[in-house]
Amino acid sequence: NPEDCWLCNLLSQAFQQKKEYDRALEMGWRAVVLSKGDNDQQINFGYLLYEIAVESPATDVLSHARRWQREYPDNPIVRHMTGAMLNAGHVSQINSVYVRDIFNAFADDFENVLGSLDYAVPSLMAEALEALAQNVRLKKMKILDAGCGTGLCGAYLKKYAKFRGLDGVDLSEKMLEVARRKKLYTRLYNQDLSQFLSRHENGYDLINAADVFTYFGELGSVFVLMFDALKPGGRILFSVSENSHNKDDYFLHLSGRFLHSKSYVEEGLKKRGFIIEKLNRVKLRNEGEAEVWGWIVMARKP
């Protein structure tokens, strides 16, 4: 009965708030089982494991992660989230099916959730473009909003794309439905970003990528594709989260998102031919009690 699994989910949240973590995990797991492995409950259980790992390091979440992995070995959400917990150091990319499913599940609540996290990335990127516009004429650009989601960046990008158009591409069809209702974009594409870029060489004056590289570990390949998709003199503007956990180039955090080192991003851009114009360290959002820091980066194709 689907109502039973949602009841278990609510009980799980209540136990978590009371810091009764073992009972929270028991109810969260029961919700997964009662739903017969429904993706919504898999996502809820994954975030429950992550939040409890952060809130209560003494709680043995890894044994729950191993059981989850054993019971649902073929589910992309389970594979990714248990991978982040059990062997984060060996993961370089995120399964695109996982990204699609997670954003399809969150599409309706996405902007409300980000609002509660003090999510600053779109406004920070808008400021970077405003600063550039003081010195460079930007009004007639063809722009790609890569990983456009619900269109949070579309509002500030649209004014720079009045004549040549603003395109958006995203894996999640449900996020694109929300973006479409805003009527900000000239065209919207439901495609994998790498595949899309490979078909649009010399197509854009600006590629905007807000919080996209949190779902890419290795960045060299996508930097090459973005370089080729830009017209000469074109720019990329993106955010990236800071890896302050270790000395690795990139690191898959317990949250299931990648963090990157500053030197890896800088060297990767230069190696692919970009000229770095801006690299500002900023607070991107809150995550629980913690602040997530990273960089707003702008780089130009000669």
Identify what each model region corresponds to:
Residues 257-272, 279:
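Short alpha-helix
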Residues 238-258:
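Short, glycine-/aromatic-enriched active-site segment of Class I SAM-dependent methyltransferases
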Residues 144, 150-196:
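Class I SAM-dependent methyltransferase SAM/SAH-binding core
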Residues 44-100:
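N-terminal auxiliary segments of SAM/dcSAM-dependent transferases
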Residues 118-139:
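Conserved alpha-helix/loop element of class I SAM-dependent methyltransferases that forms part
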Residues 220-235:
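A short glycine-rich, Lys/Arg-flanked "PGG" loop and its adjoining helix->strand segment in the class I
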Residues 208:
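A conserved beta-strand element that flanks and buttresses the S-adenosyl-L-methionine
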